[in-house]
């Protein structure tokens, strides 16, 4: 679970087995992700990003905010690394035509996870 404090997110240990939002579910023990009860195959780092976004749905985060929350503030990593992992997440979510989840880009700022309405499909 993540809590927003003064514009920053803070990781708090999630004791629940599953975190769910709309069609998306992550298993906090096995570190697996599911959309419409179908497992999506993603890397461990993409899983951490998905976990962060899932705990903050419909919230846009800057690339720097995602880096700080997922990698830690002491890591010097380029913004392109985030873009690569977001591309991986997009492809994984698009693989299943039944999955209504979408990674949205906030141009020149960052990303969020959203639920696509039936009209958007």
Where is each model-derived feature located?
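A structural micro-motif at secondary-structure boundaries
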Residues: 20-47, 112-121
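N-terminal hydrophobic or amphipathic segments with adjacent small-residue motifs
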Residues: 17, 25, 31, 66, ...
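Generic hydrophobic-segment detector
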Residues: 12-13, 21, 27-28, 62, ...
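Intrinsically disordered, low-complexity regulatory regions of eukaryotic regulatory proteins
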Residues: 3-4, 25, 49, 81
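Positively charged, aromatic-enriched patches within helix-turn-helix-type DNA-binding elements
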Residues: 32-44, 48-85, 91-96, 101
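Basic, amphipathic DNA-recognition helix from helix-turn-helix-like DNA-binding domains
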Residues: 1-22
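Compositionally biased, intrinsically disordered low-complexity segments
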Residues: 6-7, 69, 87, 106
């Amino acid at each position: 679970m993540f809590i927003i404090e003064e514009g920053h997110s803070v990781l708090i240990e999630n004791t629940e087995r599953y975190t769910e939002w709309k069609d998306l579910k992550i298993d906090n023990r096995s570190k697996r992700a599911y959309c419409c009860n179908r497992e999506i195959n993603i890397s461990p780092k993409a899983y951490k990003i998905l976990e962060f976004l899932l705990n903050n749905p419909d919230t846009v985060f800057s690339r720097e905010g995602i880096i700080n929350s997922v990698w830690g503030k002491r890591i010097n990593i380029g913004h392109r690394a985030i873009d690569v992992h977001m591309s991986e997440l997009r492809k994984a979510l698009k693989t299943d035509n039944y999955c209504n989840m979408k990674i949205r880009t906030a141009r020149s700022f960052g990303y969020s996870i959203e639920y696509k309405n039936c009209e958007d499909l």
